Amino acid sequence: MKNNSIKAVVATGIGAALFVIIGMFINIPLFANTSIQLQYAVQAFLAVIFGPVVGFFIGLIGHMVKDMFAGYGIWWSWVIPSGLVGLGIGFLRNRLHVEKGIFSTKDVVTFNIVQVLVNVLAWGVIAPLGDIIIFKEPASKVFVQGLLASVANALTVGVGATILLAIYAKSRTQAGSLSKD
């Protein structure tokens, strides 16, 4: 158990650092303060490997630190959904078996259905409502931002994390794959 705790802490730290670095240096603008964010593919990948708690803290800590470095203050209405994305996708840890070298077509479909639903809920609903409640932002603006972020993040995770998970699964040794000559 202690070893798993250490792995979780290390994965959280590395994941949050990658979240910040990728988020600060690799983004493609789409709409007012909304861009394609490649760090969500890495967060989703690590969430599936290490579970919902690690996924949550990668997004929460990573997004918070990224906002601090960006200089415009912490937008909690978007930081919290980043954590929730990792949390939601992380619940797939026990359903998918990439650690055992398995990432079937059914697993790819399951992963992508879940990540699309999680992204739509986080960015299309929770983030815009947070902007309206916390920052008094106009609903017409924030729901457009949320919709664009939902689509961009779902596509980013759908392509990027699916590739990362497939590569990772292929790198694992499947049970019974080794035989004595």
UniProtKB/Swiss-Prot annotation:
Where on the tree of life does the source sit, at the highest rank? Answer: Bacteria
Query: Any keyword Transmembrane?
Result: yes
Transmembrane ranges? 8-28, 45-65, 72-92, 115-135, 147-167
Q: Name one GO cellular component term.
A: plasma membrane
Where in or outside the cell it occurs: the entry states: Cell membrane
Family that this chain belongs to: Belongs to the UPF0397 family.
Protein name per UniProt: UPF0397 protein SMU_1935c
Native organism is Streptococcus mutans serotype c (strain ATCC 700610 / UA159)
